[in-house]
């Protein structure tokens, strides 16, 4: 069965475009829970007005995410990727459903007790995020760049769709009794269904696509053990291939060597997410003041970020816009930090139009640079090395997000009633 795929060129295999669609949906599922939480932020500010929900929940999320990805990155070669990803999607599905149960149990009332439970649920989001994002990017690093680009684009699609649905539900229920709560609950219910769909797709559809079988079989022949369960799920039971001795298996670069060869990539990803998460979502909810859009203002800003992040992740498909020069990527990443004073002075002196423009630039550059790095970095490595590098790249994304969340609290310095 494996030999059938080993002698075929990837472009001649069926299922590439189906795989791209499935990868996009799986990308949506890996971030829709977190984006749902951000998008109903206006509701949580109504229920927990004294607890800085957007800042605190983001800060709670990150340690669980980082702790999990550190463990997975260190042990990636020994971990069953199929179980890892399935557990992640199942935890996502369960956790977002628990948000609905929590709200129904408390009847939408706040207090420190429900807030602590909310924080615990958000912690499980962090575990699931590290499990799925690291597992999927590591797995897709074994395959063609189009698949990892589709998955990463799906992360942005999650943000764009959740923002759009949130604006629709807010508009639909704004003038009804308890409308904000009803809109948030319907929104979370839709997100739960999306997560459940991802469980089914990853378990029963994705592993059976011919192009996915091809790349996983190729990775197994190069010594990758993480794909064995997925190959078995696809009906490839040739044990002589799955357990064959290969001299190259013992020659793979270790994590330290991979980091040294890709230090600019990991540092750039770290800096991209330090900047992004220092502004999103806390600054946009708490530091942008009152404008003509009223309670819609923060939601519109989040939506603009998400939509332009999505656009940025598809820009590399245009060849002359795909930045592959490593020095060029570093210059672009460092230039983004000019947005910090721009946001500060716009929040203080500018109007909502300028803020929307800055948020759009933040999203566009975040998506574009992320895809350029994730698609370029794994090239030239063996299957096991690609999987390891994929996990390391996600580790630095999440570490950057954590540092960014921490730095985001600095925006509260000098603000009245900040704490």
Swiss-Prot record:
Keywords: Cell membrane, Membrane, Transmembrane, Transmembrane helix, Transport. GO terms for cellular component: plasma membrane. It is found in: Cell membrane. The chain crosses the membrane at residues 20-40, 56-76, 86-106, 108-128, 142-162, 186-206, 265-285, 292-312, 327-347, 354-374, 393-413. It is a multi-pass membrane protein. PANTHER family: EQUILIBRATIVE NUCLEOSIDE TRANSPORTER, EQUILIBRATIVE NUCLEOTIDE TRANSPORTER 3-RELATED. This is Equilibrative nucleotide transporter 5. It comes from Arabidopsis thaliana (Mouse-ear cress). The lineage of its organism: Eukaryota, Viridiplantae, Streptophyta, Embryophyta, Tracheophyta.
């Amino acid at each position: 069965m494996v030999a059938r795929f080993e002698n075929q060129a990837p472009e001649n295999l069926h299922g590439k475009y189906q795989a791209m669609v499935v990868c996009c949906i799986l990308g949506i599922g890996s971030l829709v829970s977190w984006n749902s939480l951000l998008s109903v932020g206006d509701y949580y500010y109504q229920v927990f007005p004294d607890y800085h929900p957007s800042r605190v929940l983001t800060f709670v999320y990150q340690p669980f995410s980082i702790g999990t990805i550190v463990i997975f990155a260190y042990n990636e070669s020994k971990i069953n990727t199929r179980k890892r990803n399935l557990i992640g999607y199942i935890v996502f599905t369960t956790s977002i459903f628990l948000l609905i149960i929590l709200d129904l149990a408390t009847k939408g009332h706040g207090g420190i007790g429900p807030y602590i439970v909310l924080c615990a649920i958000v912690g499980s989001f962090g575990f699931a995020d590290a499990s799925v994002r690291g597992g999927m990017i590591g797995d897709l690093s074994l395959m063609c760049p189009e698949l990892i680009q589709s998955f990463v684009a799906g992360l942005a699609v999650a943000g764009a769709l959740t923002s759009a649905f949130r604006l629709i539900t807010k508009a639909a229920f704004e003038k009804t009794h308890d409308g904000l709560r009803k809109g948030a609950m319907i929104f979370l219910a839709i997100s739960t269904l999306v997560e459940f769909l991802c469980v089914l797709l990853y378990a029963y559809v994705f592993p059976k696509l011919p192009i996915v079988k091809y790349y996983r079989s190729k990775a197994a022949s190069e010594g990758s053990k993480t794909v064995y369960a997925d190959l078995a799920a696809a009906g490839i039971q040739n044990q002589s291939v799955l357990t064959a001795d290969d001299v190259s298996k013992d020659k793979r670069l270790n994590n330290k060597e991979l980091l040294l060869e890709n230090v600019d990539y990991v540092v750039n990803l770290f800096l991209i997410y330090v900047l992004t998460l220092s502004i999103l979502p806390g600054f946009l909810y708490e530091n942008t003041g009152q404008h003509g859009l009223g309670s819609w203002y923060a939601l519109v800003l989040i939506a603009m970020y998400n939509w332009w992040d999505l656009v940025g992740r598809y820009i590399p498909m245009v060849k002359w816009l795909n930045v592959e020069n490593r020095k060029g990527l570093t210059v672009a990443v460092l230039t983004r930090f000019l947005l910090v004073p721009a946001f500060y002075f716009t929040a203080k002196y500018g109007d909502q139009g300028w803020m929307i423009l800055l948020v759009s630039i933040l999203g566009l550059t975040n998506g574009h640079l992320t895809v350029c790095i994730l698609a370029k970095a794994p090239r030239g490595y063996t299957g096991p090395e690609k999987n390891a590098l994929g996990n390391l790249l996600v580790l630095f994304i999440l570490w950057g997000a954590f540092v960014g969340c921490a730095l985001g609290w600095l925006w509260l310095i000098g603000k009245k009633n900040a704490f």
